[in-house]
Amino acid sequence: MGDNTTVAPGTNQTLVEEDLGAQITHTLMVQIMSKLNEMLTEYQPQIIGIGATVLAIFVIMFISLLIILGCNCIRPYNFKNLKRYITGKASKSVEYQPLKMSAVNMGMDEDDEFLA
């Protein structure tokens, strides 16, 4: 028999001893997993906080997008014209006009001055 084989007690079966590399790999994996588990339990509140913050940012961005695209308080006909313009169903008289900033649009009288 070779150096790396043994006979199982009470049987005639030959067992091959574990390779040293496999033992080292197993030991390293156990140490790495225990260290990861330790770090996760230690930093769990921070990880959950960061995840919740990122999720909240995405939810706020999505809701803001819905509000911006579905807002009828600015100029509802501009969004309808934009949709027709993009889809190519706009007639020659209907073209998309971007919103213009003016004192009248902002609810100011024409004689009011902008504050610097």
Curated annotation (Swiss-Prot):
- Decide whether keyword S-adenosyl-L-methionine is in the record: no
Going by the UniProt annotation, this protein carries glycans at N4, N12
Name the residues that span the membrane: 47-67
Q: Where the protein is mainly located, per its record?
A: host cell
The residue ranges for the Cytoplasmic side of the membrane come to 68-116
Ordered alphabetically, the record's keywords are: Glycoprotein, Host membrane, Membrane, Transmembrane, Transmembrane helix
Q: What start and end residues bound the annotated signal peptide?
A: none
The annotated topology with respect to the bilayer is: Single-pass membrane protein
Outline which residue ranges sit on the Extracellular face: 1-46
Q: Which GO terms describe its cellular component?
A: host cell membrane; membrane
- Which subcellular locations apply to this protein? Host membrane
Protein name, as recorded: Uncharacterized protein ORF80
